[in-house]
Amino acid sequence: EQAAPIGIIGSALRATRPPPEQAPSNRTRTESPMIHFYFHPTPNPAKIALFLTEAGLPYEAIPVDTSKGEQHAPSFRTINPNGKVPAIIDTEGPGGRETRVFDSTAILIYLAEKTGTFLGAPEDRPELLSWLLFIASGLGPFSGQAVHFQYAAPAGLDYAVNRYRREVRRHYQVLNDHLEGRDFIVGETYTIADMSAWGWLDRATRVMRGAHDPLTPFPNLKRLFETVDARPAVARARAIGKDHPFKQVNDEYTRRALFPSNFPRVAN
């Protein structure tokens, strides 16, 4: 396990905060925050929660209830124009300036480079980027679409359900084959690639609805998941936002908030 380097955490941190009009309310405050972490308890924000707890970075967890549409507020769009979580504001960004970063993969790379942790060996950097983007452009989106068509879409769309479930299995198999004889996805150490994979593997039973243990056919992948999941930082990451009353009802308002493109506005 890699510790945050000396100089990243300490008295030099500015305890500045984004103005109230630039961020949703209901914040969980921590002492001298450096990273303002905007999240909802879903797989992509979970990756960032894991990094923050692994690296020991001071942070402030700021809930964004996507089921209520808080991600569409103009105040949040100044942080992520795409209206998605996760997003962060780093009050000590490059040159000491406040910096915003959005998209889970971009945030993982940014924080890993900032702290000099969980990047693996320099010679493995091309491999690290390749697997991060494999997850970002493949495993993650296909998993998300599998969830959508099994839980949120109208019933009877068997082609879509089968398409995305099969693609998830294919991505599982690619990773499983790659992990033969390896402890981690890249190089010899635990990196942000493993954290990124963990975010969606942790929801495998939801992604593969009806499967008791969907990782069992992929023993190397299951071993990786269990290795990451057993790390002490995972329990701390899971605890973030546990006490916040996120909306649980999947009503029409929630569907409009989560899938606004399905409800185009009609011009007057």
PLM region spans:
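Short, Lys/Arg-enriched N-terminal segments with co-localized hydrophobic residues
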Residues: T16-P33
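GST-like domain detector, emphasizing the conserved glutathione-binding G-site
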Residues: S32-R163, N176, R255, V266-N268
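Short, solvent-exposed turn/loop segments enriched in Gly/Ser/Thr/Pro and often Arg
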Residues: D65, I192, G241-K242
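Phosphate-coordinating loops and pocket residues in cytosolic domains that bind phosphorylated ligands
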Residues: T78, A230, A239
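GST-like fold's C-terminal all-alpha helical module
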Residues: G120, L132-P232, R236, N268
